[in-house]
Regions:
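Single conserved hydrophobic/aromatic residue that forms the stacking wall/gate
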Residues: 1-9
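Flexible, glycine/charged-enriched surface loops at secondary-structure junctions
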Residues: 6, 23-34, 103, 128-138, ...
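Conserved phosphate/anionic-ligand binding catalytic regions in large, soluble enzymes, centered on
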Residues: 44-67, 149-170, 283-293
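Glycine-rich, flexible beta-strand/loop modules in the N-terminal catalytic cores of phosphate-handling
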Residues: 46, 51-137, 217-227, 231-236
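Structured alpha-helical segments in the cores of large, soluble enzyme domains
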Residues: 88-94, 98, 117-132, 164, ...
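Flexible hinge/switch segments at interdomain interfaces of large molecular machines
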Residues: 93-100, 132-136, 212-217, 228, ...
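Mobile "lid/hinge" segments at catalytic clefts and subdomain interfaces of large enzymes
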Residues: 164-263
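Single-stranded RNA-binding regions, centering on S1/OB-family and related RNA-binding modules
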Residues: 268-272, 279-414
Length: 414
């Protein structure tokens, strides 16, 4: 008990002394001026194999952020109170391991700090993210706290912004974040606003005012105060101070690491192409019990997502495979016209002709009289199962089946 009392007395004296030095003498614990930012450093592409990575350091606070891109089918499913919000396309996760503050303890599930800081950094970037039409990806950013001495959420905002740009996400503008503190005296006019507070100033101070934004405006604000309220001059000064600090961070540090988003996504990231089809043709692409779409996936190795309005996203790491899958989908959804030329495979031979599969789940028939220029007695004399042939569309017969001809294919198309 005696030791606890001694600690309480020491903490009260320390708090009183620190606040007095800041308020009266304008001396901060680390010797900085009231509007001075701690030493900064920024770097991108730390981890070579990930889709995007960045490191942001502010004094004794250091964050490493990693961005992962995925097709839209990988968006986070939300089961919350708002029935209108069922998915989340951009996810920012913040981790605060014990070693970042020199401690050792079990690493359990996310706590209030992890959830709150992650949500703040996530909201900070939402206004500048591209639309789904511009960038059809699900985006996940993970911020790992390597070292912590105040404002890790603001460092996470800076690191995740650079990581997104390094990953090739076409964000509209660069975003940075900074935190301001406050020490108050006996009267409303007796106060001092501090730029870029560290842990001790946060602990002994009266406010933690976090602001994120671009050169042109604010994207997110979070304020924690230990007093009953703030006057208008305090708020105005804090906002002005954070803007000045944000601009400095972006111009002098972040822009020198990466000035603008990469033109293309990382070579290891999945490539996504989008096309739009007639919603009435979705059933043709999917096929009975998914047979057609699964056949396309098996042949090309891509991933295909289709929405109810006919938007088709094809995702894969090989551009040629993506193009091949899109060609198959276009063939399946095409209203066949006389004279169109296709490449197909002989999948069935009958006495009267052969069936040619020219797209997954799509077949047409070549009558025996349309196989060769000369008369043939048996289809097998010219064709065998598995042969790849060029065919020209003759339209549809009375039963609605597609009719092909091999012999009428123009010579320059063979």
């Amino acid at each position: 008990i005696r030791r606890q009392r001694q600690m309480c007395i020491r903490d009260r004296y320390q708090k009183k002394t620190v606040r007095k030095m800041i308020l009266k003498d304008h001396k901060r614990p680390d010797g900085r001026a009231i509007d001075q930012i701690r030493p900064l450093a920024a770097e991108v592409d730390l981890i070579p194999r990930v889709h995007g990575s960045a490191m942001f350091t502010r004094g004794q606070t250091q964050i490493c952020d990693v961005v992962t891109l995925a097709p839209l089918s990988e968006v986070q499913k939300i089961d919350g109170l708002d029935e209108n919000v069922t998915t989340k396309r951009y996810m920012h996760q913040y981790n605060f391991p014990s070693y970042s503050v020199g401690e050792t303890k079990p690493s359990r599930g996310p706590g209030r700090r992890e959830i709150g800081h992650g949500a703040l950094a996530e909201r900070a970037l939402l206004p500048v993210l591209p639309s789904v039409e511009e960038f059809p990806y699900a985006i996940r950013a993970v911020s790992e706290t390597f070292e912590s001495n105040g404002s890790t959420s603001m460092a996470s905002t800076c690191a995740s912004c650079m990581s997104l740009m390094a990953a090739g996400v076409p964000i509209k503008k660069m975003v940075a974040g900074i935190s301001c503190g406050l020490v108050t005296g006996e009267t409303d006019d007796d106060y001092l606003v501090l730029t870029d507070i560290q842990g001790l100033e946060d602990f002994f101070g009266d406010m933690d005012f976090k602001v994120t934004g671009t050169h042109d405006g604010i994207t997110a604000i979070q304020m924690d105060i230990k007093i009953h309220g703030l006057t208008r001059p305090i708020v105005e000064e804090a906002i002005a101070r954070t803007r000045e600090a944000r601009v400095y961070i972006m111009d002098e540090v972040m822009s020198k690491a990466i000035a603008e988003p990469r033109k293309e996504v990382n070579q290891w990231a999945p490539k996504i192409e989008q096309i739009t089809i007639d919603p009435n043709k979705i059933g043709d692409v999917v096929g009975q019990k998914g047979k057609t779409i699964n056949e396309i996936i098996a042949r090309t190795g891509v991933k295909i997502d289709i929405t109810d309005d006919g938007a088709v996203s094809v995702c894969g790491t090989d551009k040629e495979a993506i193009a091949k899958a899109i060609d198959m989908i276009k063939i399946i959804t095409t209203d066949f016209k006389e004279g169109q030329i296709f490449t197909g495979t002989v999948v069935s031979i009958k006495e009267f002709g052969a069936f040619i599969e020219f797209a997954p789940g799509k077949e047409g028939m070549v009558h025996i009289s349309k196989i060769a220029k000369e008369r043939i007695e048996h289809v097998e004399d010219v064709l065998t199962l598995g042969d790849v042939v060029k065919v020209v569309c003759l339209g549809k017969d009375k039963m609605g089946r597609i009719s092909f001809s091999i012999k009428d294919v123009p010579a320059d198309q063979k």
